[in-house]
């Protein structure tokens, strides 16, 4: 078995691959002309062959618009669109600033309303205390019943006892 017969079938596929990668159409009698190719160069340096095929594959892949590894996948911006984007960015920036100012104003207003509410509660409490003191007076104001009073059955003057120990 000679070297030509040993490599003829794989070389035929390899040469067809090269034709495909180079966008060439093979000659009509390609299967007959493969045996006449000198294989000494290919048999002596398979690394060279592998490198040349891989570079051809990458160049073929790039013809289809697929980017190589390491390149950015994002498309380049259109220069006509860029001013519009910058204008929109400026508009959004001013809108964000206005919203931030409105939120600050609302927060300060909420704080003011809480303080007013606390002031009103205090005022209502004080007013009710004044009304109770004025209407009842200190002597007519009901005094709290203590546990000691309940236990001894003691009553306040003019009050009905609700004690269980009533005589």
From Swiss-Prot:
Q: Provide the Gene Ontology terms for cellular component.
A: mitochondrial membrane
Residue stretches in coiled coil: 92-122
**Transmembrane ranges?**
39-59
Write out the ranges of the annotated region (Disordered): 134-167
Q: Where, subcellularly, is it found? A: Mitochondrion membrane
Membrane topology per record: Single-pass membrane protein
In terms of one coarse class, where is the protein primarily found?
A: mitochondrion
User: Which residues fall in a compositionally biased region of kind Basic and acidic residues?
Assistant: 154-167
Provide the alphabetized UniProt keywords. Coiled coil, Membrane, Mitochondrion, Transmembrane, Transmembrane helix
Record-given protein name: Uncharacterized mitochondrial protein AtMg00140
Organism, as annotated:
Arabidopsis thaliana (Mouse-ear cress)
